[in-house]
Amino acid sequence: LGQDPRALTQDTFNRDLYPTPGRSYEGETEDYGISAEINWDFGNVTLTSITGYREYANSQGSDTDYTTVDILYRAPTENALARDFETFTQELRLTGEAFDGKLDWLIGAYYANEELQVRDNLRFGTQYGNFVACRIAIAINPALVNPGASNCLGANVAALDGTLTGSPAFGAATPAILAGINNLASISDLGTVSEVYNQTSENFAFFTHNIFAITDTLDLTLGLRYTNETKDFDATFRNDNTVCPTNRNLLGGFLGVPTLAPLAGGIISLSCQGNSTSELDGVSLEDSREEEEFTGTAILSWKPTPDLLVYGSYSRGYKAGGFNLDR
């Protein structure tokens, strides 16, 4: 839809795009970080410190429908499909030997703090209303389609409102159906003004990993880790698509009428596509979660010859949950 046919014959990774004039794919990305590892030797014991910090920010405007028809877009602002995060980590480890080298031991602690923000500003373009009104008009009767009219019907609406036939096409519901189509056709540059999602994560852990040389050929490895993680979430929404609640209130009563439900449902769905509605305007959400877990591993390995290793192992892993940073 809306693409120059020449684009279909070009190489997958080297081809021209034909976006809506005036829509931009301008974006900006910043990514940097620093890490440091320091080791101190104290005879048979080594202390290791690993510190890391990373910061990333990205936003990307787009002609989101990727066609010359202005259906969906993201303006190239700081809210355009933006991803920002800052992460700080610190790990401390002590390692050493005991019992004449029969035990290699390790104990440690870990801390991480991450702040993540996701933003978006996806909006309906200036031709969305006309485009989806034509979809409805085609579903009603392709012969009545007039793409030059804003509601894709124009004067042909007389064939539906009873002016020509004396019998309205949808009975007593006809005025509401036609009003819903007109409302749908009016969608132009509406939708998300901004969506902002924030998640802050704080994680700390204590761990140990030890290898016991039972004999010269038989080793037992035991590891244990305790992890505690807290995540705090909040989100705020700004949306100016008033057509969605208007058409839902206007046509929602017809969803229980079998002969009208498909048409009424189609108009409502296209009015609220992507859950875009002004009912979200000013809405804010908050939540939090805390988890703690023990994980570990146990491995028994036997090396009967220099070229053969036989082992059995058990391990239990864990990954903390989080929040979906979108709708």
Segments from the language model and where they lie:
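Outer-membrane beta-barrel domain signature, strongest for Gram-negative TonB-dependent receptors
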Residues: 1-106, 112-117
